[in-house]
Curated annotation (Swiss-Prot):
GO biological process: NAD biosynthetic process
Binding-site positions, Mg(2+): 52, 165
Pathway membership: Cofactor biosynthesis; NAD(+) biosynthesis; NAD(+) from deamido-NAD(+) (ammonia route): step 1/1
Subunit structure: Homodimer.
A GO term from the CC aspect: cytoplasm
Species of provenance: Buchnera aphidicola subsp. Acyrthosiphon pisum (strain Tuc7)
Name of the molecule in the record: NH(3)-dependent NAD(+) synthetase
Residues that, per the record, bind ATP: 46-53, 160, 189
Name of the gene encoding the protein in the UniProt record: nadE
Taxonomic classification: Bacteria, Pseudomonadati, Pseudomonadota, Gammaproteobacteria, Enterobacterales
Length: 268
């Protein structure tokens, strides 16, 4: 078995999807978990205004609405968290995403003071962190806030990770990857866009250039320039299509070099 086939099998990506069916599958997946865990009453997503969080949040809102109707239980809620670091440069996109999602509840927590406080404490101890490390601090602080809200709201922290991120390791260990459940894990980027389009998401949101925007020294830097390969090519690889050798080598090197991010902690 080639490495490509092994990765596809492991990540569970389908070569083609029917958006309506995938939307139903994602909602049913979330519903089933909540029904089987009666103490959980809310779904929590950090909404950035990007494709991944917009889709995940919309699916969660649909799940909460469906459960309220089917179970006649108004305690099922979706909570959207706004977690900017200082001023968010694409604030309009985030507001547009919120209007599209229509969350039951919204909490706004600016993480900048917490991140800088942590950095200051490290500096006092003699540890000077780089801009890159500070970026990871932001991702982990956001996840910390989500779990705090989840703990107080009988909630489940829902991940926004997908197969195109997973294969490249383009996420922060114990940051955006540290979630309870992940409904879109088997989708690639173009499939995420298809689902958003099917749900009548504003076009500028599902066509938006993906960016993590974690580093202060590289604001608004898009994912593809960091990865060295486009999501379109990554998606084709995940759909078992033939791609150019250079891109294949980049993708497979990224996968192999980030195995530790996808594995459980090492034990004896």
């Amino acid at each position: 078995m080639t490495l490509q086939k092994k990765i596809i099998e492991l990540l569970g990506v389908k070569p083609a999807i029917i958006p309506e069916i995938e939307i139903k599958n994602c909602v049913d997946f979330l519903k089933k978990y909540l029904v089987n865990h009666v103490h959980i009453k809310s779904l929590i997503v950090g909404v950035s205004g990007g494709q991944d969080s917009t889709l995940t949040a919309k699916l969660c809102q649909m799940t909460a609405e469906t459960l309220r109707k089917e179970k006649n239980d108004i305690t099922y809620q979706f909570i959207a968290l706004r977690l900017p670091y200082g001023i968010q440069y694409d604030e309009k996109d985030c507001q547009d995403a919120i209007r599209f999602i229509q969350p039951d509840q919204i909490f706004n927590v600016n993480i900048k003071k917490a991140v800088l406080s942590s950095e200051k404490s490290l500096k006092k101890s003699g540890v000077i962190i780089s801009d890159y490390v500070r970026g990871n601090e932001k991702a982990r602080e956001r996840m910390k806030v989500q779990y705090s809200v989840a703990a107080m709201k009988q909630g489940l922290v829902v991940g926004t990770g997908h197969a195109a991120e997973n294969i490249t390791g383009f996420f922060t260990k114990y940051g955006d990857s540290g979630t309870d459940i992940n409904p879109i894990a088997k989708l690639n980027k173009r499939q995420i866009r298809l689902l958003l389009k099917n749900l009548n998401c504003p076009k500028h949101l599902y066509l938006k250039k993906p960016m993590a925007d974690l580093e202060d020294e590289h604001p608004q830097q898009d994912d593809e320039s960091v990865l060295g390969v486009t999501y379109d090519v990554i998606d084709s690889y995940l759909e078992q299509k033939k791609i150019d050798i250079r891109s294949q080598k980049i993708i497979e090197a990224l996968y192999l070099n980030t195995l530790h991010k996808r594995n459980l902690p090492i034990t004896q």
